[in-house]
Amino acid sequence: MAHQIELTQTVKDSQLGQRLDQAVAELFTDFSRSRLKEWLLEGKIAVNGDVITKPRTKVMGGEVITVQAELEDEQRWEAQDLPLNIVYEDDDIIVINKPRDFVVHPGAGQADKTVLNALLFHYSPIAEVPRAGIVHRLDKDTTGLMVVAKTVPAQTRLVRALQKRDVTREYEAIVIGTMTAGGMIDKPIGRHSTKRTLMSVSPMGKHAVTHYRVAEHFREHTRLRLRLETGRTHQIRVHMAYLQHPLLGDTAYGGRARIPKGATEELTEMIRDFDRQALHAVMLKFEHPVTGEELEFHAPVPDDMVEMTLALREDAKLNRTEEY
């Protein structure tokens, strides 16, 4: 289903000489530039009553711009009563702590029982917001914090904040191998040339930057704290694999079990049985899209990663050798 919207604004004198698409973006700030340009090209925007479809048309100031368009509801997806771990909620946003084995958006691999289905059940008006308010995603087996918009204006502003890199997203991870220092990875990411469900570092890919620092050393693993500067699909997983330090448990990107020499049977079994990428979105900080208040949220590291960290720490302690 869809619902009709009709909006009117008058071009400001200060916008004299601007392109129409630029003027429209400044006047109708509740919607993204890409959405407004799409409406413009589809003939859904009129200037003084005349439909204009050329983005480069210049405005003079004083023109009345009218938008008549449809907003698609997300009602093509079923509302499902699924548990949501809600960290924070108000009239404009929801912050959730996503567990493992929970897909964010329906797709070819999974048509329902996703975060989106749960959101539609929890707050039915969110069906009027594109993608049910989802502005960024976590992989199925990545745990941690996500922010969701409950209104179109909130969604537009959050998307812009992400694009401007005004949203801080930090992750906790366990990677394979010993890393001696932190750093930054600035490598473009694109679709894998042969494995189409995976991504890879590619000169033809999109700009991608990940910052990381070492939080703790183990014998054959390292605990990291990472910060996303961009938000590409599988970004941390791809970048760490590129450094030849894939995430523990991430078999898709080379994270095969590596057992420390002389490890106990219990630790050996834990490492072999760890069946997801050891990655958790631990901190999320951003300005509230309506009030402007700075918000910061933290999600405790899940039990499976805590238990693995404790086991690796104990192994390192037991096998520490003195240097002379």
From Swiss-Prot:
Superkingdom as given in the UniProt entry: Bacteria
GO MF, any single term: 23S rRNA pseudouridine(1911/1915/1917) synthase activity
Assigned EC number: 5.4.99.23
Localization in the cell: Cytoplasm
Catalytic function, reaction form: uridine(1911/1915/1917) in 23S rRNA = pseudouridine(1911/1915/1917) in 23S rRNA
Family note: Belongs to the pseudouridine synthase RluA family.
UniProt function note: Responsible for synthesis of pseudouridine from uracil at positions 1911, 1915 and 1917 in 23S ribosomal RNA.
Identification of the protein by name: Ribosomal large subunit pseudouridine synthase D
